[in-house]
């Protein structure tokens, strides 16, 4: 049987508002039947702190530190916690909830989509596997995360190598369409990451940072040689094809599509109302 063809977009390094606007536009276009299911790869220029849809900026984020380090800042349309997007490959997958390969529940759909990432890690020679919380304590951690930092704990079907989280993802469902996007870390600047959040006191910050080192890891901490972004793209391109049993067909946005995304970025994702509303 012929494999299903999905669209593939590598949008390169883009401003934070554009990145979120393009993910939203792809969701909209797919819901309207204008485009097939899509896998997208992207990066961030400048490096950016993104926060989850429900996070409270004033309570959790040190905006002065974000400015001081010259970082971008944007609120995602998906849940989850704060992510520093810097030395990473960011991906998004846009597919209809009614797609025959998509299970009905969020966690099971998450597992199916993330199979593409799992295979990508294997192409890089890393033995990744899915973290499934077993104990009641681990399940409780998912319901009430200890910190505003995303990689603080593996969630359902998060990808783990040698017991440490290596890719963080979030999902939203709108208009009958699943949007899952996430970060595949090549390198991680923990000092910078932890300087961007507010803490009750320095002791709490130090403890969280110490715990974090035991729970999160980047690709280049695990490999004997440095994996480049181009190598990562190739591995995860093949990974998504294998994991989702699809063929990816590269696509470039038209001038009209790009203009639509830029307008959405300006009107919504660059606005204070969106980014600071909670």
UniProtKB/Swiss-Prot annotation:
Q: Site: Lowers pKa of active site Cys. Where?
A: 165
Which cysteine pairs are covalently linked by disulfides here?
none
Q: Which residues form the active site?
A: 150
Q: What is its EC number?
A: 2.3.1.181
The protein's annotated pathway: Protein modification; protein lipoylation via endogenous pathway; protein N(6)-(lipoyl)lysine from octanoyl-[acyl-carrier-protein]
* BPL/LPL catalytic domain mapped to chain residues: 33-248
Listed GO biological process terms: lipoate biosynthetic process; protein modification process
Q: Does the keyword Transferase apply?
A: yes
Q: Which reaction does it catalyse?
A: octanoyl-[ACP] + L-lysyl-[protein] = N(6)-octanoyl-L-lysyl-[protein] + holo-[ACP] + H(+)
Q: Which SUPFAM superfamilies match?
A: Class II aaRS and biotin synthetases
**Extra remark:** In the reaction, the free carboxyl group of octanoic acid is attached via an amide linkage to the epsilon-amino group of a specific lysine residue of lipoyl domains of lipoate-dependent enzymes. The reaction proceeds via an octanoyl-thioester enzyme intermediate.
Family of the protein in this entry: Belongs to the octanoyltransferase LipM family.
Its function? Answer: Catalyzes the transfer of endogenously produced octanoic acid from octanoyl-acyl-carrier-protein onto the lipoyl domain of GcvH, an intermediate carrier during protein lipoylation.
Which protein, by its recorded name, is this? Octanoyltransferase LipM
Q: What organism is recorded for this protein? A: Geobacillus kaustophilus (strain HTA426)
């Amino acid at each position: 049987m012929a494999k299903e063809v999905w669209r593939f977009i590598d949008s390169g390094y883009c401003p934070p508002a554009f990145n979120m606007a393009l993910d939203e536009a792809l969701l909209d276009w797919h819901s309207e039947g204008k485009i097939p299911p899509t896998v997208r790869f992207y990066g961030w220029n400048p490096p950016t702190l993104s926060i989850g849809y429900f996070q409270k900026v004033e309570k959790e984020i040190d905006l002065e530190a974000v400015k001081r380090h010259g970082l971008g800042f944007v609120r995602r349309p998906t849940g989850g916690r704060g992510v520093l997007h810097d030395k990473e490959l960011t991906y998004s997958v846009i597919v209809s909830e009614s797609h025959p390969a998509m299970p009905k529940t969020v966690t099971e759909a998450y597992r199916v989509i993330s199979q593409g990432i799992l295979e990508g890690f294997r192409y890089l020679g890393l033995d990744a596997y899915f973290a499934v919380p077993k104990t009641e304590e681990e399940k409780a951690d998912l319901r009430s995360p200890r910190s505003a930092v995303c990689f603080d704990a593996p969630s359902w079907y998060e990808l783990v190598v040698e017991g440490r989280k290596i890719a963080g993802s979030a999902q939203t469902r709108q208009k009958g369409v699943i949007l899952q996007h996430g970060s595949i870390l090549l390198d991680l600047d923990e000092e910078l990451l932890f300087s961007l959040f507010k803490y009750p006191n320095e002791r709490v910050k130090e403890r969280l940072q110490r715990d974090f080192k035991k729970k999160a890891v980047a690709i280049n901490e695990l490999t004997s040689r440095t994996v480049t972004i181009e190598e990562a793209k190739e591995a995860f391109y093949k990974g998504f094809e294998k994991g989702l049993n699809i063929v990816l067909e590269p696509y470039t946005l038209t001038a009209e599509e790009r203009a639509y995304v830029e307008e959405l970025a300006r009107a919504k994702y660059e606005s204070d109302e969106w980014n600071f509303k909670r």
